[in-house]
């Protein structure tokens, strides 16, 4: 195990050599490369689960004062999922957070996952990254970005890391990027303080530490890189144990069905070997399965359904889904996840009718969105929408019809925090868009109501969270099936911009300009004017980004 070197922390003021704006730009450059990586995972179901924990911890950090209003505004606070079986999570400059599927796969409760995210969030709120990078005084931002990307690659593939490293060996650079013991202790204590206000048990911190310690005792085969960047010490573990409330006996945690189901999903998304899939598919038929708790059985059935589906075994997959439905029927959130799984597997099998049926059974919040033909947003969002297309209702709220709605002209620096209901709507809307895009053209005319609802709902999502690339991409697919190619192109451009690929955004906007010149549609005039404005903005951002290379 790589040891830590004791270092003296610079005073907070000394970290000012890297301003919040500089750190944000550095983070964006790193995030852009991660978004381009084939291992970047766009899975709305797992993302909703991880991001919901992240948002609850952010709310707790604001409440406790560890996340200031300035830092919340200036940093991105974006979670990125990485499709990798190794157990890792990492905070990046500028408020970006990477979570690998291997980590979600090994935790057994929301509390354990929250403990890791709270720790990493505290590295960000305490400006540990800026303070650490301030010590690399002779290095340019490009070199620092290369160091960080190289260190991330080293956790997965040392050979690939060498191609990214700048200015030294992988081992030396990894040492430079590790947080000091004092920083780790501060992140532990600050992170643990977020748990209870966010609705999580502080015992999750200790159980996660014990899980990491157990892995640390074993011969490390490289599957737990989190241990190398965050080495455990007896002192750290004892400190966390001593901070548990006296009245909090070490009782078995209520792991919860949803946590088990999301752990199962992460296992499948980590791309296991076919032999492993076969073991998971068959385990629900063993006597040991019947002896598990209801929570554990829900995860095993979810796992078996996905494993059988990937192995092409339709009947066993359906049987596992049916068993899962029976098991979770008294747990509303677990019922919702079971229906989302049905929709997801139907989409993978390219049976959109089955996906639509499953989505129609999902509901609480999203049904209202699907049923409405007009979306009303508060006057607080007026600056995000083109003045030319807004009409005011009698109650002075802003109502934007499907025919005239336009997306943000000037997206804010970071996405607004979504409520739980809005996050759930997002998941269902993205899956709905995928299902509608798979329908044969002849069937689309029968789904005009759903198309309008999906369009309205997704436009609300991107108005609230302009950096949501997946929502923009889903909206683009809806615009295409609605016969609005110009709007589809602009939504594609916004998706690229949301992933900080401004050059690609410029390319799509230019294509939109060319299309607009040849269009005779009246409504395209408004869209063309927005494209012109966004193109100028993207060109400026692309130029600035290129200058940093």
Pin down the residues of each PLM region.
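Short pre-active-site segment immediately N-terminal to the catalytic Zn-binding motif
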Residues: 98-115
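Hydrophobic or amphipathic, alpha-helical segments that drive membrane association/targeting
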Residues: 1-90, 173, 215-217, 314-328, ...
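Acidic/histidine metal-binding catalytic segments
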Residues: 46, 133-145, 160-163, 199-209
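TPR/TPR-like alpha-solenoid repeats
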Residues: 97, 106, 124, 247, ...
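Catalytic Zn2+-binding segment of zinc metalloproteases
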Residues: 108-112, 121-138
């Amino acid at each position: 195990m790589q040891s830590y070197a004791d270092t003296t922390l610079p005073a907070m003021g000394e970290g000012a050599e890297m301003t919040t704006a500089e750190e944000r730009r550095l983070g964006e450059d790193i995030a852009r490369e991660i978004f381009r990586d084939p291992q970047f995972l766009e899975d709305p179901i797992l993302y909703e689960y991880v991001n919901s924990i992240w948002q609850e911890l952010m709310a707790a950090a604001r409440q406790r004062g560890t996340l200031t209003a300035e830092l919340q505004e200036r940093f991105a606070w974006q979670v990125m999922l990485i499709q990798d079986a190794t157990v890792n999570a990492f905070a990046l400059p500028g408020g970006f957070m990477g979570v690998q599927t291997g980590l979600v796969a090994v935790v057994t409760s929301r509390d354990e996952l929250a403990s890791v995210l709270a720790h990493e969030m505290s590295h960000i709120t305490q400006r540990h990254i800026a303070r650490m990078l301030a010590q690399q005084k002779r290095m340019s931002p490009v070199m620092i970005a290369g160091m960080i990307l190289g260190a991330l690659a080293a956790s997965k593939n040392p050979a690939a890391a060498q191609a990214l490293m700048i200015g030294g060996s992988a081992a030396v650079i990894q040492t430079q990027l590790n947080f000091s013991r004092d920083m780790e202790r501060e992140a532990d204590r600050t992170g643990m303080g977020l748990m209870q206000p966010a609705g999580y048990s502080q015992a999750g911190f200790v159980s996660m530490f014990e899980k990491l310690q157990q892995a640390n005792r074993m011969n490390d085969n490289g599957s737990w890189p989190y241990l190398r960047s965050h080495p455990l010490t007896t002192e750290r573990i004892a400190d966390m144990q001593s901070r548990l409330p006296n009245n909090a006996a070490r009782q078995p945690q209520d792991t919860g069905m949803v946590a088990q189901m999301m752990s199962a999903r992460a296992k499948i998304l980590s791309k296991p070997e076919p032999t492993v899939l076969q073991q998971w598919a068959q385990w629900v038929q063993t006597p040991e399965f019947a002896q598990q708790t209801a929570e554990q059985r829900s995860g095993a059935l979810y796992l078996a359904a996905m494993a059988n589906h990937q192995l092409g075994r339709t009947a066993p997959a359906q049987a596992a889904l049916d068993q899962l439905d029976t098991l979770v029927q008294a747990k509303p959130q677990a019922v919702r996840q079971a229906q989302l799984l049905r929709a997801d597997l139907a989409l993978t099998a390219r049976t959109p009718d089955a996906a639509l049926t499953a989505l129609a059974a999902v509901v609480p919040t999203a049904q209202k969105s699907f049923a409405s033909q007009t979306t009303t947003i508060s006057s607080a969002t007026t600056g995000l929408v083109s003045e030319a297309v807004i009409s005011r209702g009698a109650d002075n709220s802003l109502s934007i019809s499907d025919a005239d709605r336009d997306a943000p002209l000037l997206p804010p620096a970071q996405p607004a925090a979504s409520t739980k209901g809005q996050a759930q709507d997002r998941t269902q809307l993205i899956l709905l868009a995928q299902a509608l895009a798979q329908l044969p053209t002849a069937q689309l005319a029968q789904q005009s109501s759903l198309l309008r609802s999906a369009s309205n709902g997704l436009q609300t999502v991107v108005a609230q969270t302009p950096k949501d690339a997946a929502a923009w991409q889903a909206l683009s697919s809806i615009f295409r099936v609605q016969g609005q190619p110009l709007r589809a192109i602009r939504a594609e451009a916004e998706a690229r911009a949301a992933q900080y690929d401004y050059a690609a955004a410029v390319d799509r906007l230019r294509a939109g300009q060319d299309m607009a010149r040849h269009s005779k549609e009246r409504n395209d005039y408004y869209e063309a004017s927005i494209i012109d404005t966004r193109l100028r903005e993207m060109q400026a951002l692309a130029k600035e980004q290129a200058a940093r290379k």
